[in-house]
């Protein structure tokens, strides 16, 4: 193989590695966003479980947020301690006793923790692959400079 052909092949391989690194970077960004969403959902489930635990306490005043941003908050003195509404998915809710709600929330927490673990594993593998490609590209760049 001629030197020119070898240089052409090397250039194509470098371009291929660069494309792979770019694709991995996008994939890593997507995984990080997905992980952040899952962790946010996990925290919301834990907060909901804590709220269910608070229902059983006597003589408590509750704050009910009118929206997600807290633009309006209602003080509530009386809450039915025997029933809660729990979101089942899509636009479905069920009225259940607090213990059933805790069971549903425990299951949801376990599912989200498993999803988080899987995403973190995939993220770790992707970052390792990206770093390996970046190292190769860095070495190639260093050899070009010599």
Swiss-Prot record:
One GO term describing the cellular component: prefoldin complex
Keywords: Chaperone, Cytoplasm
GO biological process, one term: protein folding
Entry-linked CDD domains: Prefoldin_alpha (cd00584)
Primary residence: cytoplasm
Record-level Gene Ontology MF annotations: unfolded protein binding
Pfam families for this protein: Prefoldin
Subcellular location: Cytoplasm
InterPro entries: PFD_alpha_archaea (IPR011599), Prefoldin (IPR009053), Prefoldin_subunit_alpha (IPR004127)
Oligomer and partners: Heterohexamer of two alpha and four beta subunits.
Family affiliation: Belongs to the prefoldin subunit alpha family.
Functional description taken from the UniProt entry: Molecular chaperone capable of stabilizing a range of proteins. Seems to fulfill an ATP-independent, HSP70-like function in archaeal de novo protein folding.
Protein name (record): Prefoldin subunit alpha
Gene: pfdA
């Amino acid at each position: 193989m001629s030197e020119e052909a070898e240089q052409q092949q090397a250039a194509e391989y470098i371009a291929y590695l660069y494309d792979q690194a770019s694709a991995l970077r996008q994939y890593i960004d997507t995984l990080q966003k997905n992980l952040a969403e899952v962790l946010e959902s996990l925290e919301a489930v834990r907060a909901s479980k804590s709220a269910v635990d608070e229902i059983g306490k006597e003589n408590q005043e509750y704050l009910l947020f009118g929206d997600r941003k807290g633009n309006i908050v209602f003080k509530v003195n009386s809450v039915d301690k025997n029933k809660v509404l729990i979101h089942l998915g899509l636009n479905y809710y069920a009225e259940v006793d607090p213990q059933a709600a805790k069971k549903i929330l425990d299951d949801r927490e376990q599912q989200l923790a498993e999803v988080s673990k899987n995403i973190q594993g995939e993220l770790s593998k992707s970052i390792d692959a990206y770093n390996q490609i970046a190292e190769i590209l860095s070495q190639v760049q260093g050899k070009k400079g010599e």
